[in-house]
Amino acid sequence: MSGPSSPSSTGHWDSTTTKPPQFAPRSHNDVYPFILPKRFRGALKDKVTIITGSAGTIGQALAECFAVAGAKLVLTYNNTPPPTTLKERCVNLGASDVSFVKCNVAELKGCEDLVKQVLQTQGKVDILINNAGANSLGLFDTQPPEAFIHELAVNLHGPYYLMRLLLPHFKSQHSGCVLNIASRAGTVAIPYSTGYCASKAALINLTACVQKELDVDKLNDVHLYSLHPGGIKSVMTLTSQILPLLNLHPPPSTHSAFTQAFDTLYDDSPYLNGMTCVALATGLAKHVLRGKYVDVGQDLEDILAQAEAIKSDENLYALHTSFLGGLENGGTGAGEKPGDGLKKSAEAEGGKEGFEFPGF
């Protein structure tokens, strides 16, 4: 890709600028050439891959995509088993093995039993995909606390449990990949979806924090990612059906905005997320995107072409906060060092440095 704002053919930029140039990656709502299944056929041969929430639209697509890559699939479900045809489809696509395990990821005991069973039967785990999710929707002040807590348990506690249980294994084998299916809801505020937004935001930051610890230990072959899987139509996103069932009656303008955002804009293929996850699991982007939050709608090839731009800006593909006046997240203003304001105040008053009750 070329253009006035694209990186040069050498991958360098003008040294007089403070940051490398950027260009907008191409956007997709379906599988595109860089992540075509045929490019990754057998790329994850015999890699033991746990996929939670495998019964849903996103989970089944993940299973099929990793099957093409030759993975050994451990597909978990809680209340609803995956369709009986899923195993046959995955085997026909190239999966080394397919097994189904009932597991409630919201409970630590269930996660412990799952990890123990997989390690005993398969001898290892190579890839963990935390895909199970819950979104009960509802007004914050009337939603039953049990529903809010359940969303946190499934969306955050489950991934935490499984990551916590498997990280020692990944460290001992010096390899492993975690793909946490988050959501754009983790980076924006959406009414009637408080528990979902809060838990997905926490999941994004959990991923980044754990990767930082792994990087300190120079375990570069243990790589984690959080992802927005795209706008995929599912029971969770068809608000035109859900809002009335939940007895939610927002103002007409709000209802209209929700209907358009969820029912019209949700037109992405679940295989876009599936093949992006396969590509990331192979490690082709770990030097740039490990620990990062990735929107699968952006062209991965275009993202990787801007590795230096991403490495030079910690806010890219990460949660961050912006303040007026350039205030940094550490609490100091642009160009100031911690304590500068205190020192100036103390010097002006002719007193010693320190905080004193200001009086009234």
Roles of regions detected by a PLM:
Residues L139-L152:
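Substrate-binding pocket helix/loop in short-chain dehydrogenase/reductase
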Residues S183:
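Residue(s) in the substrate-gating loop at a strand-loop-helix junction
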